[in-house]
């Protein structure tokens, strides 16, 4: 098997909003692999990440979903739709035995009811506590038992009718008047997933690509957890085709000789660049101690260094370019990415105005 260049996987700090909305970069990939990997990861992320969702509900005195509810502004179908939008973080242990959890709710409080009014259940935590549920009129009340299970993707209420039948008597409820109503279940915690790719060295005969994956979740799992779970699902499928357990990564990926050579030649102290104290310290903390290492940094790698604000990045770019001109250094890179990404940096250095 011909070896391919080692790839790197990292989070793009310049485009990170929070742990639930961020971008990952995979590079360098052989030509065509960015599209191939990106497509399968995106489809898996949107369809196959495990979460929990309601699938059935029993509301006091409600026989069918089109029924009006006395003392409530909402009818049954609107109430169910509102409850369906509640998102949960869960403990795996409570679903190990029967893949079933129940939440009981009862109130006669007048006014608007939100997810935050639902009592806490061991092993379950509501993420979107501001989710609106219903508006109770004076003298009215609301009582329901909500049933949840683990799953993947989207299951409509018709299919959940069969799920209710399968659970049978295990769906225990103290509510005497009313029927079990099936609900649509949206298990997927990934709200958005976008992929993009670009060529790294279009002027070279050996064209390589960079894959960017932007993920936004519903806050029940982090974007990093979601992409890791997607990768495990994909690998599990390919294990059937090839003996992956016995495949050593060293057999597939070649050593990065270029990086090794650069490390050997890295002898000029970073102080020779004449950077500000703040810029130099940030580079040293990131383990860049020589001029050669700084010159070898791509624009994207530079923008991802922790504690580098806008002014520090500009300082490094200027000093780096001056040094390159002096020694005739040419790496074929441009500073376009840095110029664009500086506007995206929200965390400028302390004390820099």
From Swiss-Prot:
A GO term from the CC aspect: DNA-directed RNA polymerase complex
Pfam (any one): RNA_pol_A_CTD
Function description: DNA-dependent RNA polymerase catalyzes the transcription of DNA into RNA using the four ribonucleoside triphosphates as substrates.
Biological processes per GO annotation: DNA-templated transcription
Signal peptide bounds: none
EC number of this enzyme: 2.7.7.6
Keyword Transferase included in the entry's annotation: yes
Assigned keywords, A-Z: DNA-directed RNA polymerase, Nucleotidyltransferase, Transcription, Transferase
Note on domains (UniProt): The N-terminal domain is essential for RNAP assembly and basal transcription, whereas the C-terminal domain is involved in interaction with transcriptional regulators and with upstream promoter elements.
Origin superkingdom: Bacteria
Keyword tRNA processing on entry: no
Record InterPro entries: DNA-dir_RNA_pol_insert, DNA-dir_RNA_pol_RpoA/D/Rpb3, DNA-dir_RpoA, RBP11-like, RNAP_asu_C, RNApol_insert_sf
Alpha N-terminal domain (alpha-NTD): annotated segments: 1-245
A GO term, aspect molecular function: DNA-directed RNA polymerase activity
Designated name of the protein: DNA-directed RNA polymerase subunit alpha
Subunit structure: Homodimer. The RNAP catalytic core consists of 2 alpha, 1 beta, 1 beta' and 1 omega subunit. When a sigma factor is associated with the core the holoenzyme is formed, which can initiate transcription.
Family per similarity comment: Belongs to the RNA polymerase alpha chain family.
